[in-house]
Amino acid sequence: MGSSPILLVLAISIGLASACFLNSCPYRRYGRTIRCSSCGIENEGVCISEGRCCTNEECFMSTECSYSAVCPELFCKIGHHPGYCMKKGYCCTQGGCQTSAMC
């Protein structure tokens, strides 16, 4: 019985270690059919349009994103601002990113 809590903690740790984030998942995980280029500090974002990089927290201008590296496939809106679905339920616009039922 003493090993049950240890096994539970081990299983949770493995689950968390194998989780992926916006740019660390295999590119087909979110329905994308092209590989997106990484951008931003520590390559934590993806190029959503030419000259535009989005991370989990914000979108910004970036010279790292060329036309051949962009990844917009699913479009969404937050208010009146157009954006891109970065993952299921998550929309990024020029003003930032937030949850969205459109994605």
UniProtKB/Swiss-Prot annotation:
Annotated coiled-coil segments of the chain: none
Keyword list, A-Z: Amidation, Behavior, Disulfide bond, Neuropeptide, Secreted, Signal
Entry keyword annotation includes Phosphoprotein: no
Signal peptide: 1-19
Cellular location(s): Secreted
Description of the deletion phenotype: Viable and fertile. Gustatory associative learning in response to salt cues is disrupted. Males have reduced reproductive success, due to a range of aberrant mating behaviors.
Keyword Disulfide bond in record: yes
Propeptide position ranges: 31-103
GO biological process terms held by the UniProt record: neuropeptide signaling pathway
Disulfide bonds listed in the record: 20-25
Tissue expression summary: Detected in thermosensory AFD neurons, neurosecretory NSM cells, AVK interneurons, pharyngeal neuron M5, and the mechanosensory DVA neuron. Detected in male-specific CP motor neurons.
GO cellular component, one term: extracellular region
Task performed by this protein: Ligand for the G-protein coupled receptor ntr-1. Plays a role in gustatory associative learning. Also plays a role in male mating behavior.
Entry protein name: Nematocin
Species annotation: Caenorhabditis elegans
